[in-house]
Design a protein with these regions (language model features):
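Glycine-centered structural positions embedded in regular secondary structure
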Residues: 74-77, 224-229
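Short loop/beta submotifs within extracellular cysteine-rich repeat domains
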Residues: 35-37, 59, 100-101, 181-182, ...
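Vicinal oxygen chelate
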Residues: 1-7, 11-20, 50-53, 78-104, 110-152, 183-219, 229-234, ...
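Residue-level detector of beta-propeller blades
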Residues: 37, 72-73, 112-113, 181, ...
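A compositionally biased, intrinsically disordered/low-complexity signal enriched
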Residues: 28-29, 33, 93, 105, ...
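Active-site-adjacent scaffolding segments
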Residues: 4, 40-154
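Core segments of cupin and vicinal oxygen chelate
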Residues: 2, 7-9, 16-68, 107, ...
């Protein structure tokens, strides 16, 4: 997909990993995805914030170009909450105003964990929770416009809410971001932002045609994420947002994660929302400090599609 220069409100636009040892996180993710990092913090500042850049050829449903291109894709930083050393991946959603988003979150019954603040000259951000406790963040852009590369190998491809209260989540996120849900196959549901497909067609005029050829459900061009019910046999799993990165080979990525000291939480499998024209192969991994994430590979059954 071509490099991004901003998003529209309600779209996932950035992810970062909060790590007790960010330098170790840089080593792991650099080895896994081939990311190159630059520290955005001054040497005298407390904590570190390493912005990751990725170069990759297009190989997704959105783009068949094999020209190499690159851009900022994510970051690895110090865990900001001293009392919470747990490593985790954080999802950010684009907003016009972090302060107005905070008001919508409160009105919808969510929580404001960290009030809106300016993160250097990068963005204005805040940390919220939905009524079930799933944490998420917002991104009011300043000098940094979020992820410049998405959907390509090594870049963000999907964000998912895992929750026990699907109905409550529908109501909350509709109020905060204007989302609705649609069926996306395999019994799954996607978060759809009306009009997002029109925005994407600025980058890819044939987007809807390509999605139809791939067997994507009607309205999939508006999907910005998914909603997954937490199973009853997982009582200790809290509500949370998860991140998925595109890769060239999910099986090889899982093996490489182990070599780098990570863990395979869910071995590679073919996702139930695969279709007759493509397979989504997915694995869930953990980094050495405990942050979890998924890696997926879009595998076209038709060699003319996304290959």
């Amino acid at each position: 997909m071509p490099e991004r220069d901003g998003y529209i409100p309600g779209v996932p636009c950035w992810v970062d990993a909060s790590e007790p040892d960010p330098e170790a996180g840089v080593d792991f993710y650099g080895g896994l995805f081939g990311w190159e990092f630059e520290d955005a913090m001054q040497p005298s500042a407390e904590g570190r914030y390493f912005i990751a850049r990725c170069e990759a050829p297009g190989s997704s449903i959105f783009d068949t170009s094999r020209d190499r291109r690159g851009g900022d894709v994510a970051a690895v930083g110090s865990s900001p909450e001293a009392a919470s050393p747990t490593a985790r991946w954080n999802t950010y959603f684009w907003v016009d105003s972090a302060d107005e988003a905070a008001s919508r979150v409160r009105d919808a019954g969510g929580g404001v964990v960290v009030e809106p603040y300016d993160f250097m000259t990068v963005c204005r951000t805040a940390v919220f929770t939905d009524p079930e406790g799933a944490a998420f963040r917002v991104w009011e852009a300043k000098e940094h416009k979020g992820a410049q590369l998405v959907n390509d190998p090594g870049a963000l491809v999907f964000n998912s809410l895992n929750t026990r209260d699907v109905e409550g989540a529908r109501s909350f996120y509709a109020s905060v971001f204007g989302w609705r849900t649609i069926a996306i196959g395999g019994g799954g549901e996607g978060w759809a932002l009306p009009g997002y497909g029109d925005y994407l067609e600025r980058y890819h005029p044939d987007l809807r045609t390509r999605m139809a050829e791939a067997g994507a459900p009607e309205g999939f061009e508006d999907v910005v994420g998914s909603i997954n019910p937490i199973a009853d046999d997982q009582p200790d799993t809290p509500a949370h947002w998860s991140v998925t990165f595109a890769v060239d080979d999910a099986d090889a990525t899982a093996a490489r994660a182990i070599e780098l000291g990570g863990t395979v939480i869910v071995p590679p499998f073919d996702a139930p929302w695969s279709t007759a024209t493509y397979t989504i192969r997915v694995t869930v991994l953990g980094d050495p400090q405990g942050a979890t994430f998924a890696a997926s590979r879009f595998v076209p059954r038709n060699k003319g599609l996304g290959s």
